């Protein structure tokens, strides 16, 4: 028995040597044969064996709605886009906003969408398209009641798809983006402010009238005992502004009473006469102090009056006979003498 087994083993070893020689003949330079393993397919097997569910973007009766991906409510429509727009895009957006505003307002004014929406009397403040035309924001005016605002918002969101379908059927735009109704916060703030002013307490009617009258009281009226006038100096650049303001107020009061015209005419006549007198007195005179201070104080006027009756001196060239007769007298360096002639 053992002899037979040893013979079989020897024959099997011979077969192995034969196969090796054959492989060496078929593949010269290759001492070993091809080797295959199932390890390379272990990743594929692991993927098929996993029990994770595939995410679908649609609802199916077999899968159910629980496996459908549900993004946050209006997240992709309300997010702000950072894409820069050109000047031409802004002009196009303004035109489309006006077109959509008119179309949506017409739909809200008719029961074509729904009778419930028509009964709510919703008013739109503006319509704004996003720069990438992914959504159409319609801002509607709110009311003072929070419950009514919530009901209106629910009805508007429910009717948004139907309104979009009507706009596309009317060919307002070729592709109308999804419509999103948003509460106008500015209008809500104004409504709240009006409500607060309506319930505000401004005091009795008489006190309010007195308050208004005190605001427009006469500036010359005596001040109450408890008040004090400002102690700051009203003089600037040598001008008393307080006195000047009093003169102006006095002139205004006289003008209102009908006396200002006469006073003004008298002042103008007085100024004209003074100017004429000044022109007559403007004659060549000797060198004297002609400063503004002396003129204003009246010193030059007195000098002019003294010079009116004084003799006038003039220079002339004497004859040769007079020069010989007056050789003994004083001469001027240039051969000219001065004489006085009284007119």
Curated annotation (Swiss-Prot):
Compositional bias (Basic and acidic residues) at which positions?
325-343
Q: Which InterPro entries match?
A: KH_dom-like_a/b, RbfA, RbfA_dom_sf, RBFA_mitochondrial, Ribosome-bd_factorA_CS
Give the residues annotated as coiled coil: none
An annotated GO cellular component = mitochondrion
Q: What is this protein called?
A: Putative ribosome-binding factor A, mitochondrial
Question: What Gene3D superfamilies is this protein classified in?
Answer: 3.30.300.20
Q: Where is this region: Disordered?
A: 214-234, 275-343
* Keyword Transit peptide in record: yes
Superkingdom in the source lineage? Eukaryota
Q: Where in the cell is it found?
A: Mitochondrion
**What family does this chain come from, according to its entry?**
Belongs to the RbfA family.
- The chain's transit peptide is found over 1-41
Major location (coarse):
mitochondrion
Pfam families in the record, alphabetically? RBFA
Gene Ontology biological process terms from the UniProt entry: rRNA processing
């Amino acid at each position: 028995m053992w002899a037979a087994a040893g013979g079989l083993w020897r024959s099997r070893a011979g077969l192995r040597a034969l196969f090796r020689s054959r492989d060496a003949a078929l593949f010269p330079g290759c001492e070993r044969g091809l080797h295959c393993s199932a390890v390379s397919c272990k990743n594929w097997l692991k993927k098929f064996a996993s029990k994770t569910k595939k995410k679908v973007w649609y609802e199916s009766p077999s899968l159910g709605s629980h496996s459908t991906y549900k993004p946050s409510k209006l997240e992709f429509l309300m997010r702000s886009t950072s894409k820069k727009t050109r000047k031409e895009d802004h002009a196009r957006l303004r035109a489309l906003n006006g077109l959509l505003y008119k179309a949506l307002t017409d739909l809200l004014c008719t029961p074509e969408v729904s009778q419930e929406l028509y009964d709510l009397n919703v008013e739109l403040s503006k319509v704004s398209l996003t720069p990438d035309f992914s959504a159409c924001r319609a801002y509607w005016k709110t009311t003072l009641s929070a419950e009514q605002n919530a009901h209106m918002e629910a009805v508007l969101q429910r009717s948004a798809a139907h309104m979009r379908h009507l706009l596309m059927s009317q060919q307002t735009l070729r592709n109308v983006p999804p419509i999103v109704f948003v509460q106008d916060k500015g209008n809500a703030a104004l409504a709240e402010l009006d409500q607060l002013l309506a319930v505000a307490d401004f005091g009795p009617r008489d006190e309010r009238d007195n308050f208004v009258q005190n605001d427009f009281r006469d500036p010359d009226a005596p001040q109450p005992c408890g008040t004090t006038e400002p102690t700051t100096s009203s003089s600037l650049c040598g001008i008393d502004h307080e006195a000047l303001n009093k003169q102006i107020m006095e002139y205004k009061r006289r003008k209102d009473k009908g006396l200002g015209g006469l006073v003004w005419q008298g002042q103008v006549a007085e100024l004209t006469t003074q100017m004429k007198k000044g022109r007559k007195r403007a004659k060549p005179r000797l060198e004297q102090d002609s400063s503004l201070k002396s003129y204003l104080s009246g010193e030059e006027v007195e000098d002019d009056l003294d010079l009116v009756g004084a003799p006038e001196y003039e220079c002339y060239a004497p004859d040769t006979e007079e020069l010989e007769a007056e050789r003994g007298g004083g001469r001027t360096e240039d051969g000219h003498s001065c004489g006085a002639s009284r007119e």
